[in-house]
């Protein structure tokens, strides 16, 4: 029973860290990266379709993304979807290839992005702490029902705290790496 609670907490904490990494990958840095456009959907046969299903996105160089659209008729829709996104990008098309130059980030915009990233990381920490709380509540319920002893409860809570510390440390490492990436000129 205790092992199930610990395993569940571990899995949920790992998912929280992965979700944070995924969210942070969408934050624009000064460098071109295909995942930058991963959140963009294009209207395709009446359905919103992720960009990576209707086109191939590659980093042409450090400041340019190249998008090869599979269906010529979608080129304008892809361009429009990129312009309508809140990324502040201006695509230029040449046939079926769309080039998206990334303007350099201003110092002020970098600082704003760092604040956003820190907020995301704090959200990740809160999620991990909530998972710890849920696990500890499950342990208290077992203790109350006399399914485990107080010693087992205390030991399990200490182990869950260790899992929490590891997850928070991972979040801090991800945050530090993203901040460093954002502040590079």
From Swiss-Prot:
Record's superkingdom?
A: Bacteria
Q: Which Pfam families match?
A: RRF (PF01765)
Intracellular or extracellular location(s) = Cytoplasm
UniProt keyword terms in alphabetical order: Cytoplasm, Protein biosynthesis
Q: What does this protein do?
A: Responsible for the release of ribosomes from messenger RNA at the termination of protein biosynthesis. May increase the efficiency of translation by recycling ribosomes from one round of translation to another.
According to its UniProt entry, one GO biological process term is: cytoplasmic translational termination
> What is this protein's record name?
Ribosome-recycling factor
Source organism: Vibrio parahaemolyticus serotype O3:K6 (strain RIMD 2210633)
């Amino acid at each position: 029973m205790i092992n199930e609670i610990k395993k569940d907490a571990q899995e949920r904490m790992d998912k929280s860290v992965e979700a944070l990494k995924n969210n942070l990958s969408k934050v624009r840095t000064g460098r071109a990266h295909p995942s930058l456009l991963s959140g963009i959907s294009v209207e395709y046969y009446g359905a919103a379709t992720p960009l990576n299903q209707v086109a191939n996105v590659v980093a042409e160089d450090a400041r340019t993304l190249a998008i090869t659209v599979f269906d010529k008729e979608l080129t304008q829709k892809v361009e429009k979807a990129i312009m309508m996104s809140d990324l502040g990008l201006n695509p230029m098309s040449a046939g079926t290839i769309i080039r998206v130059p990334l303007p350099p980030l201003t110092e002020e915009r970098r600082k704003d992005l760092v604040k956003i990233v820190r907020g995301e990381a704090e959200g990740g920490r809160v999620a991990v702490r909530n998972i710890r709380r849920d696990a500890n509540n499950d342990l208290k319920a077992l203790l109350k029902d006399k399914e485990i002893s107080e010693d087992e409860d205390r030991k399990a809570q200490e182990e869950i705290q260790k899992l929490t510390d590891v997850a928070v440390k991972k979040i801090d490492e991800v945050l530090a790496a993203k901040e460093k990436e954002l502040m590079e000129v």
